[in-house]
C-alpha cells in the first residue's frame, strides 16, 4: 500500500481550517427552515401582484450587481449574455477538480482541463456551443487560465477523500410564491449534517483579493441550503487561490436571517431600479475596469485613472 502523500503547509492549513470535532459542530432547531421561509414569503409577498404570471430568477450575481452600481446594473440588463474565456474558465476548472477527485492516476492538471473541455463540449447548452465554435486563440487562453486555477487548487488543497463527500458545482434552488426562484451553484461542498447537527462546509474558490460581496455570496447559498435541508451548513469559507488563504465564517441564525433580509431588500431594489422611476446611482469601484457602461461613465473613468487595484473575482 502506498504511503499517504506528504502535505505542504498550505494543505495542512486547509485541513486545520475545515476540521472540527463532533462536539464543536453546532445544533439548530428544526423550526429555523420554516421561519426563514416565512421571512421570505412575507417579505416578497408585496411584489407578487406586480409579477403575476412572470418568473423572477434571483442569483448571487444579480443581488451583488444591484447592491453595487445601479448604472452598471441597468447597462448589463441590456447586454445579451455571451460566453467568453473569463466566463467559461471557472466551469472548466470546477469540472477538472471534480474529475481529479475520482481520477485513478496521478492527476495532471492540463490533462484534467482537456478532459473537462472535451466533456463539456458534448453538452447541449450554450457553453457547449461556444466550446465547439471558439477560436484556437480562445481555446488556448481557456486552457491556460483554467490550468492555472487547477494547478493552484491541487497545490494548496490536500487530496479530497471520498469520505469527506466532496461535491463540485452543487446546484441549489428555492421557489417562493411560484414566482421568485433563488438559485446558484456552490463551487465545492464538503461533509454532511447529522440530524440537527451542522456538518457541511460550503466553499467558494476565488482568484484575486477580498471583496465584501464574497461573504454575501456564501450567505445566500447557506440560506437556500438551510431551507432545503433544515440543518444549516457549519461553515462558509472563501478560498483565495492566488494567496493560498481562507476567509472562514461560522453559520449562525443571525447570519441566515440577515441573508434573508438582504434577499428581500435586493428584490425590491431590482424592481425599483428596473422601473426607471429615478436616476440610477453610480458607485465607482474596481468593477469599473470591465463595466459595459464605462465609455459613457465619467465617474468610472476617474476612478480607474487614480490607479486603484482590482478586487477579487469569481472563477
Regions found by a protein language model. Give the residues of each.
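Mg2+/Mn2+-dependent nuclease catalytic core
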Residues: 168-261, 265
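Anion-coordinating catalytic cores for phosphoryl-, nucleotidyl-, and glycosidic chemistry
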Residues: 42, 63-64, 186, 286-289
